[in-house]
Amino acid sequence: MRSFWSFPSSCLTAVASSVPRPASRSQAARVLHNLPRALTAFPQPSRTTRAFSLTSRLFQHLRAASDEETMTVNTTDRLAALRSLMKERNVDIYVVPSEDSHASEYIAECDARRAFISGFTGSAGTAVVTLDKAALATDGRYFNQASKQLDENWHLLKTGLQDVPTWQEWTADESAGGKSVGIDPTLISPAVADKLDGDIKKHGGAGLKAINENLVDLVWGDSRPPRPSEPVFLLGAKYSGKGTAEKLTNLRKELEKKKAAAFVVSMLDEVAWLFNLRGNDITYNPVFFSYAIVTKDSATLYVDESKLNDEVKQYLAENGTGIKPYNDLFKDTEILANAAKSTSESDKPTKYLVSNKASWALKLALGGEKHVDEVRSPIGDAKAIKNETELEGMRRCHIRDGAALIKYFAWLEDQLINKKAKLDEVEAADQLEQFRSEQADFVGLSFDTISSTGPNGAIIHYKPERGACSVIDPDAIYLCDSGAQFCDGTTDVTRTLHFGQPTDAERKSYTLVLKGNIALDTAVFPKGTSGFALDALARQFLWKYGLDYRHGTGHGVGSFLNVHEGPIGIGTRKAYIDVPLAPGNVLSIEPGYYEDGNYGIRIENLAIVREVKTEHQFGDKPYLGFEHVTMVPYCRKLIDESLLTQEEKDWLNKSNEEIRKNMAGYFDGDQLTTEWLLRETSPF
């Protein structure tokens, strides 16, 4: 294994490294947080350190790591302490969301409050604690994991199943009889807070109360991990394709359109994108704790200034951006609120824009409903449409990523079949990371690799743990969902393989999923079509047999940013209805099928939305389609050709030819990988 957070010389100006002690294997693999690097300028900025590898000391820590994904934590004392604090503050029900104050999907360990109080470590879920009950709500991806991790104090709410209440409904029901509900206002959006408050009152509750001190933090006490404070670095024009000055100009045009005085930027990836900066405060996501305020004539970045080197400071100054401490944000929003209140009654009220994902606390600090408009972030919309530099970077990095995966799958088959090696899921994932690290501009993983054999593949977000995971069974389906961060792009790919002889049922299931992937990949649709409208294309072949999967079909992907990026996606979420796909979007196409206790199948490619030529243009609209950039073949022995149409076979042949062409030169002298690639891409 060679696991590191590497900073190629073409990506950074200067780097120095240090290796901390991780508490578990998954923490160690989370290179963005747990392998922090000191990014400092050298006397000659052009000279850099290429990469950082783990020391033998780190290997020892990895081997000693605990099995955090299946361990049940006794939460009795934690709940008792929380309930004591609730009583002191006259709170009958306390809500603990998963998010941090920036609405991040992936969070720093210091913000893992829901995991701490409940013991459930999945990325999605909400805990609700009353004075005598506790409930944890999560979606279908995590039913199995939550069932294993929650102790007897907790009731699992399986969100999405018939007759199962949402956490909001459960909370409102429990509030009957005048009970008060409390929440940290930095961890909930105004829209969710307003609706929850209304639902509580409809059920006879006292309403939702903002509790400005986080009660879980008080229970956590000195054991709570410190907030990360890793260095921030500049992403050059070679990778960003657009300067901060231009991005600020475009944002100010949006302020003019909406007649707003300022936009308060609260999403970490939006701050990073706007200022062409990257960090490593959040696991797998190259972001850093920060806010920003952009007015018609100023821009201010709120960040711990000690994280910025001279190059970053100079870049910000050249692009008209000031720097203030991270903790000054709420003080300055209150100044804006007071300025807005001072306008005369005859004037139209001053309006400030915030993202519809911004916190309730931020809206309150800016003056509330009168002075705040919650909007779909104009930065998020702009970020989702990649420029040509970013798109070309995505194409390039996926070729390199594909080379690493092809080499890995050939190696894994050889180890299991020819050498009869006994490899567990983590050992295999370690080797994949090693192969990726050998590629140019590799920085780290984009999420924890899902290396899963047999029944583990049916756990949609399964995470193997060192010393407590399964040995890969060559006679069972193997599902590998993985991704990487490169300076020129972010990857996310899933392939499902079989190293022995699959059953007819397994081949049929795999082929139905593959047909759905092809159907969506080849779809042509008018501009203005949303991912909501396209979702059924990927499910249609499963539906014919009464089958389905409990996750979305696709999500947006950042450019050397978050692997899950809004506002676009393909699925049945209401949010996707109002956001049409547009040329320049990059998103995943990943249908699947899962049999609990047996196996999981998922096939995932990343694709660019682009304009396509059609014979006609009804409605004088451009028509759009997809350009897939993932360069990894499908498992030949799992494909039942009898279920494929000739068009689907032609598509596979064209795709395989493209993969072989792009892999030219990558495996010179590597007979094992070359033979594997030729076999898996042989014509149908």
Swiss-Prot record:
<feature type="binding site">
    <location>
        <position position="481"/>
    </location>
    <ligand>
        <name>Mn(2+) 2</name>
    </ligand>
</feature>
<keyword id="KW-0479">Metal-binding</keyword>
<dbReference type="InterPro" id="IPR029149">
    <property type="entry name" value="Creatin/AminoP/Spt16_N"/>
</dbReference>
<keyword id="KW-0031">Aminopeptidase</keyword>
<dbReference type="InterPro" id="IPR036005">
    <property type="entry name" value="Creatinase/aminopeptidase-like"/>
</dbReference>
<feature type="binding site">
    <location>
        <position position="492"/>
    </location>
    <ligand>
        <name>Mn(2+) 1</name>
    </ligand>
</feature>
<feature type="binding site">
    <location>
        <position position="492"/>
    </location>
    <ligand>
        <name>Mn(2+) 2</name>
    </ligand>
</feature>
<dbReference type="Pfam" id="PF16188">
    <property type="entry name" value="Peptidase_M24_C"/>
</dbReference>
<keyword id="KW-0464">Manganese</keyword>
<dbReference type="Pfam" id="PF00557">
    <property type="entry name" value="Peptidase_M24"/>
</dbReference>
<keyword id="KW-0645">Protease</keyword>
<feature type="binding site">
    <location>
        <position position="604"/>
    </location>
    <ligand>
        <name>Mn(2+) 1</name>
    </ligand>
</feature>
<dbReference type="InterPro" id="IPR033740">
    <property type="entry name" value="Pept_M24B"/>
</dbReference>
<comment type="similarity">
    <text>Belongs to the peptidase M24B family.</text>
</comment>
<dbReference type="InterPro" id="IPR001131">
    <property type="entry name" value="Peptidase_M24B_aminopep-P_CS"/>
</dbReference>
<keyword id="KW-0378">Hydrolase</keyword>
<dbReference type="GO" id="GO:0005737">
    <property type="term" value="C:cytoplasm"/>
</dbReference>
<dbReference type="GO" id="GO:0046872">
    <property type="term" value="F:metal ion binding"/>
</dbReference>
<dbReference type="GO" id="GO:0070006">
    <property type="term" value="F:metalloaminopeptidase activity"/>
</dbReference>
<comment type="function">
    <text>Catalyzes the removal of a penultimate prolyl residue from the N-termini of peptides.</text>
</comment>
<dbReference type="InterPro" id="IPR000587">
    <property type="entry name" value="Creatinase_N"/>
</dbReference>
<keyword id="KW-0482">Metalloprotease</keyword>
<dbReference type="Pfam" id="PF01321">
    <property type="entry name" value="Creatinase_N"/>
</dbReference>
<dbReference type="InterPro" id="IPR032416">
    <property type="entry name" value="Peptidase_M24_C"/>
</dbReference>
<feature type="binding site">
    <location>
        <position position="604"/>
    </location>
    <ligand>
        <name>Mn(2+) 2</name>
    </ligand>
</feature>
<dbReference type="GO" id="GO:0006508">
    <property type="term" value="P:proteolysis"/>
</dbReference>
<feature type="binding site">
    <location>
        <position position="590"/>
    </location>
    <ligand>
        <name>Mn(2+) 1</name>
    </ligand>
</feature>
<dbReference type="InterPro" id="IPR000994">
    <property type="entry name" value="Pept_M24"/>
</dbReference>
<dbReference type="InterPro" id="IPR050422">
    <property type="entry name" value="X-Pro_aminopeptidase_P"/>
</dbReference>
<protein>
    <recommendedName>
        <fullName>Probable Xaa-Pro aminopeptidase P</fullName>
        <ecNumber>3.4.11.9</ecNumber>
    </recommendedName>
</protein>
<dbReference type="Pfam" id="PF16189">
    <property type="entry name" value="Creatinase_N_2"/>
</dbReference>
